[in-house]
């Protein structure tokens, strides 16, 4: 087979996936960008080109800035906690112990539960006076508290749900990476007198950097795409304390019927995710390949 024939054969193999990617990813993105420069049609009034008016409206929108701030706090809390917990769980269940399979299943179970089911389970835990959390705090003599109804604790309560659900999912990737490591590394470190913590810090964790990069990218995406739990548990309240960017976009587009403004919000979210992804690859790619 000639070089040109191999080149053509390779592109023919890529063509179905490339067509689907263009149809369901690139085309909607370009369509959203185009619509963000138009006004929303009202009644008999057709959409008109308004340029950057939607983006100027966005810059003056206090709810957008609150949702962005909430999302940044949510990401700052859930991403490191879920990754650290996943790594700790993977390191634990990777060792030899009785009931290791059941423990792995217990850790992974929250991941396979439907999002709405998880939200309802935790909604019961947080129910004032009757919820499981209230019963536990009451037994300790602590005062009753409305966890989802208080601005100071509502976002933290949602973060706990996300960490509980995502840590088991990330654990699977870390566990797979740990199982691929040669046991001779640990044996050599033990012979040299290295402590378990030193071996983890200097050998295990650097070898896990490719997995950590993959997990981190997924964790960032998950932190900016939460809608289900908010709809079921708080609906963005109290006083927009739990409104995140994607939920605010959902409300603008489907509750207030302003899809063009929602398109502008979506482009801002895509830009934020793009910058976050570039920063992750730029900083972590060097550590992954030891540059």
Task: Tell where the protein language model's regions lie, with residue ranges.
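A structural signal for multi-pass alpha-helical bundles of membrane permease subunits
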Residues: 6-291
């Amino acid at each position: 087979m000639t070089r040109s024939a191999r080149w053509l054969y390779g592109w023919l193999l890529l063509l179905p996936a490339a067509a689907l990617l263009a149809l369901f990813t690139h085309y909607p993105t370009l369509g959203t960008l185009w619509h963000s420069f138009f006004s929303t049609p009202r009644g008999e009034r057709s959409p008109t080109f308004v340029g950057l008016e939607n983006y100027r409206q966005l810059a003056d929108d206090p709810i957008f800035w609150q949702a962005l701030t909430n999302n940044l706090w949510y990401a700052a809390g859930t991403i490191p906690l879920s990754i650290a917990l996943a790594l700790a769980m993977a390191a634990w269940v990777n060792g030899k112990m009785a009931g290791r399979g059941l423990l792995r299943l217990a850790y992974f179970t929250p991941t396979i539960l439907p999002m709405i089911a998880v939200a309802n389970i935790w909604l019961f835990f947080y129910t004032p006076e009757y919820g499981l959390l209230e019963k536990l705090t009451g037994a300790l003599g602590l005062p009753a508290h409305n966890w989802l109804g208080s601005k100071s604790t509502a976002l933290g309560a949602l973060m706990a749900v996300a960490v509980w659900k995502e840590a088991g999912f990330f654990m699977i990737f870390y566990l797979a990476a740990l199982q691929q490591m040669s046991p001779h590394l640990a044996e050599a470190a033990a012979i040299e007198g290295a402590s378990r913590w030193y071996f983890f810090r200097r050998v295990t964790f650097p070898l896990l950097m490719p997995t950590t990069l993959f997990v981190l990218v997924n964790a960032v995406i998950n932190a900016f795409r939460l809608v289900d739990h908010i709809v079921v548990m708080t609906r963005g309240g109290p006083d927009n304390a739990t409104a995140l960017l994607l939920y605010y976009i959902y409300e603008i587009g489907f509750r207030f019927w302003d899809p063009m403004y929602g398109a502008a919000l979506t482009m801002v979210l895509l830009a934020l995710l793009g910058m976050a992804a570039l920063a992750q690859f730029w900083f972590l790619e060097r550590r992954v390949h030891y540059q």
